[in-house]
Swiss-Prot record:
GO terms for cellular component: chloroplast; mitochondrial large ribosomal subunit. InterPro entries: NA-bd_OB-fold, Rib_uL2_dom2, Ribosomal_uL2, Ribosomal_uL2_bac/org-type, Ribosomal_uL2_C, Ribosomal_uL2_CS, Ribosomal_uL2_dom3, Ribosomal_uL2_RNA-bd_dom. This is Large ribosomal subunit protein uL2cy. GO terms for molecular function: rRNA binding; structural constituent of ribosome; transferase activity. One of its GO terms (biological process) is mitochondrial translation. Its main location: plastid. Residues 1-22, 224-273 are annotated as: Disordered. Gene3D superfamilies: 2.30.30.30, Nucleic acid-binding proteins, Ribosomal protein L2, domain 3. Part of the 50S ribosomal subunit.
Length: 273
């Protein structure tokens, strides 16, 4: 990823660092409009996810997470920006005339060939079942349910590792540090998701953040008591509690948010860090 640093001409561009290499030119038959409503509200209009709203209009790119074009080689034609995710996407032209978008694997360039199937080479961008991969393979876009499509390790720079295979299950180390079991028949894509340097980007100004649909974050200690448990007091005052809390009074730091007694608890060998 090519990082472009702005010249110091105005305060808004003084600290900006953006990607100037990849552009967006989507195909009409692979995009469709989507209606954003709610902006972090539930059905009653109450805020359940803060700091969301506004943002530029987006067209959704239909991504092929299933990779079900079996044993048909495809060629990478373009590498494009996708406003709906921080990873890039590739337009693939398959030998049978099919055209689809996939996540951009790290290191893939225009003109490379990829293929999905059961007996395909272990090379970057190829998709195949976990049972056909050697131990230690770096993978992304991993299925949890057979045939449903990849659901794990899809963000920019994400990569998981196949560390064991036993019986009907394979053991994976996920990007979060979690170690869990997945059926060996589920498929995944070899390699790491591209755009690894996404964390090096600096928007430089608040307006660029608003384009992404992210609104300002306000500290609870400067709110009124009716709005936040930390609010109230005269002037600059402490939160008045032993530990920080959420706006709804739950512990804010270190509290586990995973739902208890989920069906997949038995598949997780080590929880995430």
């Amino acid at each position: 990823m090519a990082i472009h640093l702005y010249k110091t001409s105005t305060p808004s561009t003084r600290n900006g660092a953006v990607d100037s290499q990849v552009k967006s030119n989507p195909r009409n038959n692979l995009i469709y409009g989507q209606h954003h409503c709610g902006k972090g509200r539930n059905a009653r209009g109450i805020i359940t996810a803060g700091h969301r709203g506004g943002g530029h209009k987006r067209l959704y790119r239909k991504i092929d997470f299933r990779r079900n074009e079996k044993d048909i080689s495809g060629r990478i034609v373009t590498i494009e920006y996708d406003p709906n995710r921080n990873a890039y996407i590739c337009l693939i032209h398959y030998g049978d005339g099919e055209k689809r978008y996939i996540l951009h694997p790290r290191g893939a360039i225009i003109g490379d060939t990829i293929v999905s199937g059961t007996e395909v080479p272990i090379s970057m961008g190829n998709a195949l079942p976990l049972t056909d991969m050697p131990l230690g393979t770096a993978i992304h876009n991993i299925e949890i349910t057979l045939g449903k499509g990849g659901q794990l390790a899809r963000a920019a720079g994400a990569v998981a590792k196949l560390i064991a295979k036993e019986g009907k299950s394979a053991t994976l180390r996920l990007p979060s540090g979690e170690v869990r079991l997945i059926s060996k028949n589920c498929s995944a894509t070899v390699g790491q998701v591209g755009n690894v340097g996404v964390n090096q980007k600096s928007l430089g100004r608040a307006g660029s953040k608003c384009w992404l649909g992210k609104r300002p974050v306000v500290r609870g200690v400067v709110m009124n008591p009716v709005d936040h448990p930390h609010g109230g007091g005269e002037g600059r005052s402490p939160i008045g509690r032993k530990k920080p809390t959420t706006p709804w009074g739950y512990p804010a730091l270190g509290r586990r948010s995973r739902k208890r007694n989920k069906y997949s608890d038995s598949l997780i060998l080590r929880r995430r860090k």
